[in-house]
Amino acid sequence: MEIVYEGTFTEASQTDFNNQLTAAQSAGADMIFLPIYYTPASVILTQANAMGYAPTFFGVDGMDGILTAENFDASLAEGVYLLTPFSADSEDEMTQNFVAEYQDRFGEIPNQFGADAYDAIYTLYQAIQAAGVTADMSNEEICDA
């Protein structure tokens, strides 16, 4: 694999990627790595499609949620590779319980961000349980536990 183009953008310029896409296409890039969040990624996929440019897109966990991005045609994400630490399809019992409870409460399948928040709170819960923290303890007692 050879890197043929490297491009960047700023927060202020994340609504128009035509220059970067044109440069990547002109350089012959047949794969584009997107280590970004899903909102700018949805714009990139939309603009690439509009210009007829169809490289393979490879993203990371920040792109989890792209299918629910506002005003995004989710069909454009078909074939995008995504590396993420969470899969709602996991057969793990704890994951399936989380997915079911999340879906009941919010009416949608959770993405990696919801799973990360759950993991953070569950880790705190486990630490509190292991330390024997109770509601009547002072801040100092909790810290010492």
PLM features: residue spans?
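Extracytosolic ligand-binding ectodomains
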Residues: 1-145
